Amino acid sequence: MRSSLLSSEKQTNTLLIAERATRLAPSDPVAHRARAIALTDAGQLDEAIREYERAIALRPGHYSLWVELGRARDQVDDQQGALEAFTEAARHAPYYAQPHWQLGNVLFRMGRREEAFAELRRAALSDMTLLPAAIDLAWAAYDGDARAIDRAFQPQNAPWHLALARFFARHGRPLEALEQFRAADKIPDTERRAFLQDLLAAKHFEESYEVWSGGLETKNTTRAGGIASITDGSFESGIKFDDPGFGWQLTTAASAFRYSLDTVEPKEGAHSLRIDFNGDYNPASPVVSQLVLVERGARYRLHFAARTEELVTGGLPVVVVSDASSSNGRSLAESSPLPQGTSGWQDQTMEFAAGDGTNAVLISFVRRSCGSGPCPIFGRIWLDQFSIDKL
C-alpha cells in the first residue's frame, strides 16, 4: 500500500512539473513530449495523444515522436491512427529499425500480412536481433509453411539463411533447414557447429552428416555418403575433444582416465587409442563413442580389436551399439567384456539389426555396472580397427 501511494505521488509530481514546463515553454516540443509521457504513465492516454500531436506540430520531422504517438494510439485501439503515425515515422527514418518494426506489427494485426512482413523484413535488415521474433511470428502466421516463410523474408545474405536454417531445424523441417544452410554458402565454423548441434538434437541425422562432413579438413576422414561408415576406425587422424558430429566423441569430464594415441604395437596402421584408467567414474558414461548412419531395417556386423594391460575392475568394459533414433537409446547389441589382467590383441564382432525407424546408431565404449557402491577401474586398454559391414 505504501509503495503504491508513493508511486502515485511521484506520478502526480512528474505530471505537475511537465505541465509547468509546457506553460513556461509552449513552443518547446520537448516540454510537450515530457507531458505526454507523464500523462501516459498516469493512464490518461487520450490527453497524452493530444500532447504528442502538439509536440509533432512543433517538430514534424522527428521520427521518435511519431513512434510514440503510434504506440499511444495503438493502446487505445486506434489502429488506423497508429498506422498513420508509424508510416510517418518510417518515412522520416527509413533506415531505423523501430519505425518499420512498429509499422509491421500494426499491419499484421490489421490482417495485411504481406505488407506487414515487408516492414518487418526492413526492420530486421537494420537490426538483426529482431529477426528471430519476426520468424516466430511468420511461423505462426503461415502455420509452419517453410516455403511461405522463405518467401516472406526473401533472405539475401548468409546470416539470414542461417537464422532460417536453425529455426527450421529446431521445428522439424530438416530438408528446408538444409536448403537454407546450402544457400548460406560459406559461414563461420562456430555457426556451422551451432546449426549441426540443432540438427543432432532434433535427431535429423542424415542432414547432420552433410553439415558435419562439409566442415571436414582431415584428409584421412571418411566422407562418402556416410552410410555404415566408421570415421577414423583406426585412430589415424588425431584426437579431437570439441568436434560434434560423426567422429569419435571423447569425454573431457572425467579425471579417472586419459587418452593418448599409441604408436607401440597398433593392431593396424600407425596408431591405436590408448586409455589409462586410474579411479572411479560412472560406468554408464561412454568413455569413447561414435554416431554412425545406417540403413533402416538393415543388418550389420561391427568389428573391433582390443587389448588390455593390468586391468582391474568390478565393471568390465564393453562396446555397445544403441539406437540413436529412438527416444530411449535402446540397446541393439553388446560385445563380450574385455578381459581382466593383461591380454594381447583380441578381435571381436557383434551383429545388430537397425529398426524400421532407425537411421543412426551410437557405438559406445562403456563399462558394465558393478552392482553397488563405487566402481573404480585401473589399468590400460587399447582400441583399434573399428569397421562395420552390411550383411
Which role does the model predict for each range below?
Residues 129, 155-391:
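Extracellular and organelle-lumenal recognition/adhesion modules and their flexible linkers in secreted
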